[in-house]
């Protein structure tokens, strides 16, 4: 069983994915102004790779951004690739 927990601190935070209460990966973010959520890192620990945990973290981040009514700046190359390739996620990318 997996769970995703969110931790916020100041102008940033992270989502931590747990498998049987063991940390399996994380995605970090920071706020820029009130309309941009910058996702700057996504990583899944080696022994947990291949289980789609990175995408699960991204989807949790997108859900969070939607709740807050903001767009995402995908500084993390993996997040950018996933969002640009999925037509349903492209509209969540912040554009100037």
What spans do the regions from the language model cover?
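C-terminal structural segments of small proteins and small subunits
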Residues: 64-96
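Conserved acetyl-CoA binding element of GNAT-fold acetyltransferases
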Residues: 36-46
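Active-site rim helix/loop that mediates acceptor-substrate recognition in acyltransferases
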Residues: 1-14
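Conserved acetyl-CoA pyrophosphate-binding loop and the N-cap/start of the following alpha-helix
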Residues: 48, 52-57
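Aromatic/hydrophobic pocket-lining residues that form π-stacking "cages" and hydrophobic walls in ligand
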Residues: 61
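Conserved beta-hairpin
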Residues: 13-24
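A conserved beta-strand-loop-helix scaffold within acyl/acetyltransferase catalytic domains
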Residues: 9-10, 27-36
């Amino acid at each position: 069983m997996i769970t995703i927990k969110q931790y916020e601190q100041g102008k940033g935070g992270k989502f931590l994915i747990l498998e049987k209460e063991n940390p399996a990966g994380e995605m970090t973010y920071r706020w820029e102004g009130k309309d941009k959520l910058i996702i700057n890192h996504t990583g899944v620990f080696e022994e947990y790779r291949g289980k789609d945990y990175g995408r699960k973290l991204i989807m949790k981040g997108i859900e969070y951004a939607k709740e807050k009514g903001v767009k995402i700046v995908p500084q993390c190359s993996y997040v950018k690739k996933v969002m640009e390739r999925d037509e349903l996620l492209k509209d969540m990318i912040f554009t100037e």
